[in-house]
């Protein structure tokens, strides 16, 4: 029987799970438990959510006691300065993760809660934390450093950490494999465009820039997050609108981005609203594309020479119009999109640039769960079935 890894992604009100065979590169089952802790929900907490996940797996004919389970992999958003490799979880590590909650108050606490519950319910297998920030741990100092008082930054560990690292690393490796070229011989730009969105510049397999910063709030316009913002807006709202820090943080994370501009964060529904002539929806889309093009142009300059641009995640993989508009008029910079390829259906990695485009443009489906599962096997010493 092949070894399997259960990958868990615990959010504040949801728990996603997937049972993966990392050697074969296949998913055995996947699901999500939502509305955890909501007043009208039958799922009161993460313990009940995990029990429900086990029940859903059982309904698919999967018994975690007999399916070859060797590890549980937990996605943890923020690893701070200490955690930059997949890490075997124990009480000491969990305590350190709890200390990092100040850096990621919206993301790390539910992940730690999910870890505690899973370790209690699946006590006989290894539990491994895989960090969103790990891939960007060694960003060049010029890219990682904020231009603020150095003593303050050092004392409070303020730097650009970057997120979606598991996805950016996976996609860059898949792009190299698709092109049949060594990873350390390519300069790449990866555009991870989903409800959360980020960009990265990767030189010869090593990240040299990324759009997210101390938190996942910086960078591109997202479904509900503002992305880049003048810090003066925060103090202005505090002084003049009498908004508290928590209120401002909640607005920037949950009521901004596409939702704040157009009242809609789902791009499929946004397009329907645009077709009705809604000017707010049209503006929201234009702001999103403008910010994306700005980062793309910046990263072309950072890399100097770029070999490939890859689109991934829900919007990047499925929205041909976003890809078209993001790359429009960039022939002079070496990017020539093939419109038929861009519009055509496809499964797996595929090229959407013309054959003579100096920079290859790809669509590469991400698979963070598979990447996390493989990281778990590496932590366990490359255990195989």
UniProtKB/Swiss-Prot annotation:
Required co-factors: Mg(2+); Mn(2+)
Catalytic residue positions: 132
Positions annotated to bind ATP: 16, 192-196, 266-268, 314-318
Compartments (UniProt record): Cytoplasm
Gene Ontology molecular function terms on file: acetate kinase activity; ATP binding; magnesium ion binding
GO cellular component labels: cytoplasm
InterPro entries: Ac/propionate_kinase (IPR004372), Aliphatic_acid_kin_short-chain (IPR000890), Aliphatic_acid_kinase_CS (IPR023865), ATPase_NBD (IPR043129)
EC number: 2.7.2.1
Site (Transition state stabilizer): 164, 225
Pathway recorded for this protein: Metabolic intermediate biosynthesis; acetyl-CoA biosynthesis; acetyl-CoA from acetate: step 1/2
Annotated substrate binding sites: 75
Binding site for Mg(2+): 9, 368
Pfam assignment, any one: Acetate_kinase
Record flagged with keyword tRNA-binding: no
Keywords, ordered alphabetically: ATP-binding, Cytoplasm, Kinase, Magnesium, Metal-binding, Nucleotide-binding, Transferase
Co-factor binding comment: Mg(2+). Can also accept Mn(2+).
GO biological process: acetate metabolic process; acetyl-CoA biosynthetic process
Listed transmembrane segments: none
Catalysed reactions listed for this entry: acetate + ATP = acetyl phosphate + ADP
Similarity section: Belongs to the acetokinase family.
Task of the protein: Catalyzes the formation of acetyl phosphate from acetate and ATP. Can also catalyze the reverse reaction.
Subunit text: Homodimer.
NCBIfam families: ackA
Name the UniProt record assigns to this protein: Acetate kinase
Lineage, opening ranks: Bacteria, Bacillati, Actinomycetota, Actinomycetes, Mycobacteriales
Gene name of the encoded protein: ackA
């Amino acid at each position: 029987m092949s070894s399997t890894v259960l990958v868990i992604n615990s959010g504040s009100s949801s728990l996603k799970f997937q049972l993966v065979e990392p050697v074969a590169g296949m998913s055995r089952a996947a699901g999500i438990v939502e509305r955890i802790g909501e007043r009208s929900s039958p799922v009161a907490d993460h313990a009940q959510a995990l029990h429900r996940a086990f029940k859903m797996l059982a309904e698919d004919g999967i018994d975690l006691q007999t399916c070859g389970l060797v590890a549980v992999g937990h996605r943890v958003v923020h690893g701070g300065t200490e955690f930059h490799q997949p890490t075997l979880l124990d009480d000491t590590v969990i305590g350190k993760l709890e200390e990092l909650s100040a850096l990621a108050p919206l993301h790390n606490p539910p992940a730690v809660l999910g870890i505690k519950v899973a370790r209690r319910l699946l006590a006989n297998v290894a539990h491994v934390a895989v960090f969103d920030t790990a891939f960007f741990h060694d960003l060049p100092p010029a890219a990682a450093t904020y231009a603020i008082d150095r003593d303050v930054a050092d004392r409070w560990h303020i730097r650009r950490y970057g997120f979606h690292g598991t996805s950016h690393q996976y996609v860059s490796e898949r792009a190299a494999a698709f092109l049949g070229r060594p990873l350390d011989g390519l300069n790449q730009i990866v555009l991870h465009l989903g409800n959360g969105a980020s960009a990265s510049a990767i030189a010869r397999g090593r990240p040299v820039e990324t759009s997210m910063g101390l938190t996942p709030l910086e960078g591109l316009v997202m479904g509900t997050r503002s992305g880049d913002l003048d810090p003066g807006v925060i103090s202005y709202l505090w002084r003049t609108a009498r908004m508290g820090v928590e209120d401002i943080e909640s607005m920037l994370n949950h009521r901004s981005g596409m939702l704040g501009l157009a009242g809609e964060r789902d791009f499929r529904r946004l397009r329907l609203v645009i077709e009705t002539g809604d000017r707010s929806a049209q503006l929201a889309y234009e702001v999103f594309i403008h910010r994306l093009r700005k980062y793309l142009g910046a990263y072309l300059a950072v890399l100097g020479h770029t070999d490939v641009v890859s689109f991934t995640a829900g919007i990047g993989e499925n929205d041909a119009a976003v890809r078209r508009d993001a790359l429009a008029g960039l022939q002079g910079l070496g990017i020539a999109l093939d419109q038929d390829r861009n519009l055509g259906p496809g499964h797996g990695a595929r090229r959407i640039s013309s054959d003579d485009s100096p920079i290859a443009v790809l669509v590469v489906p991400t698979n963070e769960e598979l990447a996390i599962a493989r990281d778990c096997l590496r932590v366990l010493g490359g255990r195989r079935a």
